[in-house]
Amino acid sequence: MPTDLPYAAEAESSLSPDELEVLRRQYYREIEQGHVTIQSKFNYGWGLIKSPSPELETEGVKLLQEIYSASPDHRRECTYYIAVGYYKLRNYAYARKFNNLLLSVEPGNMQAQSLSTLIENAVKRDGLVGIGMITGAVAVVGLIAGSVWKRSRR
């Protein structure tokens, strides 16, 4: 699902497994030492969000939300990536919520504006897919009901 939006590339690019492993090792080394820096936690959360795995993306959102809740000084930098994580997880309501939060403070933020476009396009696309599935299901039910009705009239 590549995008033509230059600022939204972040939402659709991934880290290599080796790059993610470097961030993971740093984060867990600090856990073993008994003190995790906000920067290491942020870097690892960011890396997890840039993973192609929904499980890892979910973990990344969780780490960034922990920073968001515990450290008001780091909320701005977490807000965009939390929105990206929710977008990648197809949780568009939360993606929109966090992205709009950032846009309310920084209306000119090009990354957030591009992400907003991606979110809205995804909502429309998923809505059309949902309508298509419902229409197909109704058609099948109609065919079955018509067939049953036709047989009962014989």
From Swiss-Prot:
Similarity annotation: Belongs to the FIS1 family.
Segments passing through the bilayer: 128-148
GO biological process: mitochondrial fission; peroxisome fission
Keywords, ordered alphabetically: Membrane, Mitochondrion, Mitochondrion outer membrane, Repeat, TPR repeat, Transmembrane, Transmembrane helix
Membrane topology: Single-pass membrane protein
Superkingdom assignment: Eukaryota
GO cellular component: mitochondrial outer membrane; peroxisomal membrane
Organism, scientific name: Cryptococcus neoformans var. neoformans serotype D (strain JEC21 / ATCC MYA-565)
Residue numbers on the Cytoplasmic membrane side: 1-127
Protein name from the UniProt record: Mitochondrial fission 1 protein
Gene3D superfamilies: Tetratricopeptide repeat domain
Residues in TPR repeats: 76-109
Mitochondrial intermembrane side: 149-154
Function in brief: Has a role in mitochondrial fission. Has a role in outer membrane fission but not matrix separation.
SUPFAM superfamilies with a match to the protein in the record: TPR-like
Localization, UniProt: Mitochondrion outer membrane
